[in-house]
Amino acid sequence: MLGLLLFGGVWTAMLVHDAERRYPATGSFVRAGEARLHVLDRGSGPAIVLVHGAFGGAADWDPTVIDALAARHRVLAFDRPGHGHSDALERCDGDPREQARVLIEAWRALGVQRPTVAGFSYGATVALAIALEARDDVGALVTINGAIHSWGGTPEPAYDLAAVPALGWVFTHTWATPLASLVAPTSVRRAFAPLDVPSTFDRSPVALAIRPRNFAANAADIDALDPFLREQERRYRELALPLVVVVAEGDLVTTPSIHSHALASEVPGAELVSVPGAGHQLPYTHASVVVDAIERAVERGRR
């Protein structure tokens, strides 16, 4: 047993070293409460905040979405707390409201007021939490293949194990990263299906996301997600701001009928943007659709 743990620990150290060597931080850092967040801050004009999904990072928006938006807007793409190059929160229990609070503090520290907030996948959960908990701090909202409603999900054993005191630390620092690296290609293909994985896919968020501390943060996020959504979904009718809901009809990760279509029908005045034949990873495969949706939300928020 000790030999297996040592082998896993060495393998983990090699994967972490390679990921950090190949994918250093390319943005700046901002202090928000107890955390230091990594942010890609580009352009000028009406502000847009981009919130990435699970096992992702700010680089998921870069360069296509960020560059297109930065031509006319100030764009802030954060690594969420505990993800990418950002610090984890002291209390890592997966509550999206805590991430929402820290992101608001971060953009305020950068002099931004009432941005349009766009969230992809799990990032939409956080974006909705921002809009519900701090309505006056958001100009408009965009969800992109969002995790929005409870779907009756059951916890993954690996994520549960990562949360166990002491034993979870051993798991995340020995075998979690190697095992995640082996299943990552299958997960990536599913995220792009029914389309192929494009050559432009930036693998840096995945490589960084399976490092021990990042794996633990992702595990906490995903483990807490379905119970949290059972509470948050009761409040969606409270949303009283411009909302654009972007959905890929072929998404295998966040089922369109459960998540995006349901939200669009619940919120008066919501605009639904449907993308036939596309999969979950719209920021990569249909960046122009994502950019257009965000820009329309910005304009609606300024009226």
Segments predicted by a language model, with ranges:
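Conserved HGGG/HGGXW glycine-rich cap/lid loop of the alpha/beta-hydrolase fold
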Residues: 42-85
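Short beta-strand/loop motif that positions the catalytic acidic residue
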Residues: 239, 245-247
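Catalytic active-site module of serine/aspartate enzymes centered on a nucleophile-bearing elbow/loop
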Residues: 268-303
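Alpha/beta-hydrolase fold catalytic core
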Residues: 1-47, 71-73, 112-113, 299-303
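Acidic catalytic loop of the alpha/beta-hydrolase fold
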Residues: 224, 250-254
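Flexible "cap/lid" loop of the alpha/beta hydrolase fold
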Residues: 132, 142-173
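Active-site loop/oxyanion-hole signature of alpha/beta-hydrolase fold enzymes
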Residues: 40-42, 77-118
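Conserved alpha/beta-hydrolase catalytic His-Asp/Glu region
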Residues: 18, 153-158, 176-238
